[in-house]
Amino acid sequence: MSKFLVKAPAKINLFLHILGKNSNYHSLESLLVFVNIYDILEVTIDAPRSGVYFTNLKINRYNNTITKVIYLLSQHSTSSVNVFVSVIKNILVSAGLAGGSADAAAVMRLLGNVWDIQPQVLEELALEIGSDVPACLHSKTLFARGRGEDILLLPDLCLPKYIVIVAPKGKPLSTVKVFNNYEPSAFSSPICDNLPVRQDDWLELIYNARNDLLDTALKFVPEIEEILFVLRKFRNCLIARMTGSGATCFALFNELSDAEVVVRELQMTRPDWIVFNAKIL
């Protein structure tokens, strides 16, 4: 029996554009970063039994992204041992932060290494779990398109590091619900053929971009609009935007001191919001 401790970082979509839809999936373009908010997973290989335990008891222990990973990877391994995963949930659930995908990717990385499964196989299997899982396998700044499987890593992109994350308490928002109700008057035009080369051009793109799912998310959680309005009023806020399918929002800052001012004020004045600092990895 072997035990491993792994971390799964939360994801932020700096922008999210929807380009179209086929019979099953939406096609998208998104710039993703990962931040220092982690779920902590204890993975026991060759355990007495297989299973998953979450500190957040609202998550289905028997049908979730981790159980799917264990099943899929066991089909590509000669190992037939039990795997048990205990998860300390720090990433908000159903909040646009890809907590389930991050957990799945963390387990995939570990089991792929222990069971000697090729990275290309892991990337193919990741998409079977969810559209954010391929990006979460990398957990680095990247540009994703398609369903999320077409990934361009951006190791040299230097972004503002400090993020204030705000979510309305008790307002989880299902990704499936938002996408199923997304009915745009027109889809966004692709930018993938003309991606920026210079640092300043990337920053300009980020500032002028958007989250195409915002209007749909507002139908279910109108409070998102107030959160964004409040964040944008703070000094030196570069952008304020919703991440993923919501309802979590973020504000981006160059200086930690500016972000700390926002967190202190909102934690004192808005007990109905979850507010905390984060840093881009």
Swiss-Prot record:
It holds the Pfam family GHMP_kinases_C. The active site is at K11, D132. GO terms for molecular function: 4-(cytidine 5'-diphospho)-2-C-methyl-D-erythritol kinase activity; ATP binding. PANTHER family: 4-DIPHOSPHOCYTIDYL-2-C-METHYL-D-ERYTHRITOL KINASE, CHLOROPLASTIC (PTHR43527:SF2). Pathway: Isoprenoid biosynthesis; isopentenyl diphosphate biosynthesis via DXP pathway; isopentenyl diphosphate from 1-deoxy-D-xylulose 5-phosphate: step 3/6. Catalyzes the phosphorylation of the position 2 hydroxy group of 4-diphosphocytidyl-2C-methyl-D-erythritol. This is 4-diphosphocytidyl-2-C-methyl-D-erythritol kinase. It comes from Ehrlichia ruminantium (strain Welgevonden). It catalyses: 4-CDP-2-C-methyl-D-erythritol + ATP = 4-CDP-2-C-methyl-D-erythritol 2-phosphate + ADP + H(+). ATP binds at L92, V93, S94, A95, G96, L97, A98, G99, G100, S101, A102. Its EC number is 2.7.1.148. HAMAP family: IspE. NCBIfam families: ispE, PRK14608.1. GO terms for biological process: isopentenyl diphosphate biosynthetic process, methylerythritol 4-phosphate pathway; terpenoid biosynthetic process. Keywords: ATP-binding, Isoprene biosynthesis, Kinase, Nucleotide-binding, Transferase. Belongs to the GHMP kinase family. IspE subfamily.
